[in-house]
Amino acid sequence: MSSAQREFEIVLYGATGFSGMLTGQHLAQRDTNARIALAGRSPQRLRAVRDKLGPLASDWPLVVADASQPATLEEMATRAQVILTTVGPYTRYGLPLVAACAKAGTDYADLTGELMFCRNSIDLYHKQAADTGARIVLACGFDSIPSDLNVHHLYRRAAEDGTGELAETNLVLRSFSQRWASGGSVATYSEAMRTASSDPEAYRLVNDPYTLTTDRSAEPDLGPQPDFSMRRGRDLAPELAGFWTGAFVQGPFNTRIVRRSNALQDWAYGKQFRYSETMSLGRSFAAPIASAAVTGAIAGGIGLGNKYFSRLPQRALERVTPKPGTGPSQKSRERGHYRCETYTTTTTGARYLATFAHNVDAYASTAVLLGESGLALALDRDRLSELRGVLTPAAAMGDALLARLPQTGVVVSATRLH
């Protein structure tokens, strides 16, 4: 049976967790007539979640599946056209579902922010997924759709204008309201550092800027590409004169997703494409101090974590960190916002700015982004790329998302500056 003829168009796996419930709420508010099912380990908890989602979700079927029982994942994959998964940490729980979807030719989207999970998915299942026609799309939340879509938008705009390929390209997180992390986010960062610190090869790979590329030997030598740096805004773009920027904690992951997008599309952005991410720390007299402090703290914390985290007792950490399935309150999420600006200079000297902004917090936005990724994969198949295998959001469905996301309150734009 082809994936388009299957019982469900979308299965949301992990529907009872924090991110899963938010994604379910978003899908239930979108009157799409899509055939949607909720999946997880407990039918009782699934039923309780469904009861809270409103009338459009009242007849959504429930599917029992468990990451520790691969046969249940395989059966779920054969029934679905698309599976959205919020079950993490993905390094610990994710590969069996990737395997099931690659085998069944089922499209897949997740919320991973874990480099080694991405690398293992590519190494183990890219070829099989390409052969069966599956799109295994990584990082479909705040990690890394704003980063990936902004660059894709710039690429499309420069190509339309005939102004050459992208060269120096920098994302600046201009505003961000998030104060609290969910239990799932904490578990994800912990698992990523535990993996890097317990395996010398993993440590080497997470420090390679082209960890996720299709062919490491084909990548150009663009010199050092540090993950963390403090920079004057004017060094990134004239429009940022007076500002200071510092390290962005998600930069090491997002940058590698964006570079994979370039490689998957046969380096369509260009072989001179050089990409970095920072966050704005304002333009006050204290901004340079804040830039140095934030950059040092993030670089030092992640650097030490990637080396030594595995030495920390896991149970002790679990007692003092948020539990998986928990997250910020609804009031906190509704007060949230973020704005990402990506500046590029093309090989002909043309300059552009892409903006990606959402007037909700990163968790509420992630639910929208994952939900719309699922709807794009299921319903917008004529807008998807021809690529198959282990993909990125931009490489799989960049044009579909650029068309779809503005319907949900996400602001996307690409403007020529010079």
From Swiss-Prot:
It is an enzyme of class 1 (oxidoreductase). SUPFAM superfamilies: NAD(P)-binding Rossmann-fold domains. The keyword Oxidoreductase applies. Keywords: Lipid biosynthesis, Lipid metabolism, Oxidoreductase. Its EC number is 1.3.1.-. It comes from the Bacteria. GO terms for biological process: glycolipid biosynthetic process. GO terms for molecular function: oxidoreductase activity. InterPro entries: NAD(P)-bd_dom_sf, Saccharopine_DH-like_oxidrdct, Sacchrp_dh_NADP-bd. Belongs to the saccharopine dehydrogenase family. Enoyl reductase subfamily. This is Trans-acting enoyl reductase.
